[in-house]
Amino acid sequence: QKDFFLPSLNLKYNLSEKHSLRLGASKTYTLPQAKEISPYRYVGVNFNSQGNANLKPSDNYNVDLKWDFNPTPTELISLTAFYKLIKNPISRIEVASAGGYLSYENIADKATVAGVEVEVRKNLFVRPLSSAANGMNKLSFGLNGSYIYTNAKMPLATVTTGSQLEGAAPWIANFDLSHNFTKGNHSFINTLVFNYVSDKIYTIGTQGYQDIIEQGMMTLDFVSQAK
């Protein structure tokens, strides 16, 4: 049994009616998932895996600084810088064995995570209908993108000098274009959504094995809603 002391600090300073700064600092922890700590073998579609009962929880020390600009109540431009120190990070590894299976380890004493994130929500036009029609015609878009740097010196890894953390994609981007037509008690919303995630490490290679890379992907979806 382990006791956790988890302090948290959040500060906000309004530079003006439309500009604000936020500072956050906290300590959190990550417990191993059931499949990561269970000693039983799991048979998957692509890989078999087995948990590690000796895994330790990860301690996370987080700091972020955020600037918000609200041109209007429904619009936003935001920029965030963040840093995280992780003690005893948990990662999936490939075990050198005849059966070839994946397991989980506290892969390093510590790991660092740093990055920036930008978010934009903008109205391209907002046109009220006539007072008799009681409605609105609105076109808007949203953009969210981030770059994440991760690094850890891993004694168990094939490349011990430093590697990305498992599951952390360096580049992530999301974009949506939405048309909202409202008239009386009825509304029609059509949204085009684009998402991109870059290549990321699926499994960290050990004992001569190379890292297994999960290929990045792009998706494009169209969502229509009426009520």
Regions found by a protein language model. Give the residues of each.
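Membrane-embedded beta-strands that build the outer-membrane beta-barrel scaffold
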Residues: P7-L15, H19-K27, V63-P71, E75-Y83, ...
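Subset of outer-membrane beta-barrel
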Residues: F4, N62, F125-S130, K183, ...
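Short, glycine/charged-rich beta-strand-loop motifs at protein surfaces that mediate ligand recognition
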Residues: Q207-E214, D221-Q225
